[in-house]
Amino acid sequence: MSLTVESTSFNLQYPIIKEFINTQLEKCYWTANEVKVEKDIHDVLVNLTPAERHGVFTTLKLFTLYEVRAGGDYWTGRFMREFKQHECQEMAAAFGMVELCIHKPFYNKINELLNISNAEFYTDYVKNPTLKARMESIDTIINHPNSLVSLACFSLVEGMVLYSNFAYLKHFQSNGKNKLLNINRGINY
């Protein structure tokens, strides 16, 4: 059975997809308020250099924007429209829910505590040609005419964007810095 054709049965056709869903919901589930990021605000505002603070602000801004693209535009948007098999629909709903209802609020919560969560903060990336190009490339990937190319490229970019930014935030726990402990707890989930 094709993943792009709606099934007339609710029998499990793709056990691996069901495993992905269960892992996401049972083993990786947490809430945005579970991690007490307010404990890291002092680190960001006082203990980081201006360059480090700029890097953290840029990372948090792009994470929040990216979660909207990943959860809304991709998983519950394109993927759900094109992959109609029941397990695919469930997976898209689960992945989209995590992006939109856990990750996005988690990053935005930090931004709110830093008093930077406003329209200007979330739109000024367009003034930076590199950041603007990065977000435009994500939109291009999501809207690629070939569904499989879109899926492959989106998965690759999601991994590269997330893990490179995770590495940046995690470096604040290395070499004796011991900063941003709670923000990194959210990443460790």
Predicted regions and their residues:
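Non-heme di-metal
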Residues: 1-189
